[in-house]
Amino acid sequence: MKIAVDAMGGDHAPKEIVLGVMKAVAQYKDIEILLFGDETKINEYLTDKTRVKIIHTDEKIESDDEPVRAVKRKKKASMVLAAQAVKDGEADACISAGNTGALMSTGLFVIGRIKGIDRPALAPTLPTVTGKGFVMLDLGANAEAKPEHLLQFGLMGSVYAEKVRKIDRPRVALLNIGTEETKGNDLTKKSFELMKNQDAYEFIGNIEARDLLMDVADVVVTDGFTGNMVLKSIEGTGAAFLSMLKMSLLNGFKNKVAASFLKKDLMELKAKMDYSEYGGACLFGVQAPVVKAHGSSNANGIFTTIRQVREMVEKQVVETIKAEVDKVKVGGTEAND
């Protein structure tokens, strides 16, 4: 199994990318890594070249580059070359911690969309109070969506949850402002109707945002605009809560003593809410596994993303989506590439 990795994408590239790769090849003897980027900089952190190949390029996509323009103009960028390796059959999947929009554009323009899938979807696994986590899509690939798209999102998320997260018959829910079937706008009402009348996956109905982290669903479907706001709200709320908790525990001698006894429990709580432990965000709907690692990923974050991609390839997630897509085909959907 060969995995193409953009060594130059992310806040801590290439150091943390390379260190994560080193950890992965040491752990998994069945993978080979193709590292795309500045060879001199990569070699500074490369401690073992076993099953690691460097493909040198000086070009990279910056975090503030306009995604589509950058992908079209920077043909030799590390991210683009990693995707091209997948397109050419030289790698089975690709990973980048770089510009999210550029990676989505690269996935669509270079690797290509699955026939029968109208829109791709960005899908991370988010934490729950039980530590189990849930897959949520779309979180930003599409600002607007149609009911047919959300129907397909449910299928893609369900396949991933079953194959990679090892959940038998995953519970798929639709994000809405209420649990009743009649609640919501035109998009959610029509999506509910389509999802209710299919048998490709287990649809359990609507879910409210306040219940997302309570482990009531394994897959949650929404449009990209709403999903991205939910993600940022969860991130911001979590960070604010931890900050307030820290200030409270360090305020006064008694609280500091209590904090010393609670340190281990608090660290476990923080780890449980750290969704980087689940890997990166999958770009579903393209012809091969493409995963966006968090931009601030450290070596462990890259390692967990490689582990995630390895599972996707091994369990044939993309192939299963291709085989199952006709089960959620709706008359009048868009033509595909």
Swiss-Prot record:
- Gene Ontology molecular function: phosphate:acyl-[acyl carrier protein] acyltransferase activity
Judging by the UniProt lineage, the source's domain of life is Bacteria
Q: Name one GO cellular component term.
A: cytoplasm
Q: Which SUPFAM superfamilies match?
A: Isocitrate/Isopropylmalate dehydrogenase-like (SSF53659)
The Enzyme Commission number assigned here is: 2.3.1.274
Q: Which Pfam families match?
A: FA_synthesis (PF02504)
Its UniProt entry gives the catalysed reaction(s) as: a fatty acyl-[ACP] + phosphate = an acyl phosphate + holo-[ACP]
Q: Name one GO biological process term.
A: phospholipid biosynthetic process
Q: Write the record's keywords in alphabetical order, separated by commas.
A: Cytoplasm, Lipid biosynthesis, Lipid metabolism, Phospholipid biosynthesis, Phospholipid metabolism, Transferase
Predominant place of localization: cytoplasm
Relate the protein's function as given in its record: Catalyzes the reversible formation of acyl-phosphate (acyl-PO(4)) from acyl-[acyl-carrier-protein] (acyl-ACP). This enzyme utilizes acyl-ACP as fatty acyl donor, but not acyl-CoA.
PANTHER family noted in UniProt: FATTY ACID/PHOSPHOLIPID SYNTHESIS PROTEIN PLSX, PHOSPHATE ACYLTRANSFERASE
Q: What is this protein called?
A: Phosphate acyltransferase
Species whose genome carries this gene: Listeria welshimeri serovar 6b (strain ATCC 35897 / DSM 20650 / CCUG 15529 / CIP 8149 / NCTC 11857 / SLCC 5334 / V8)
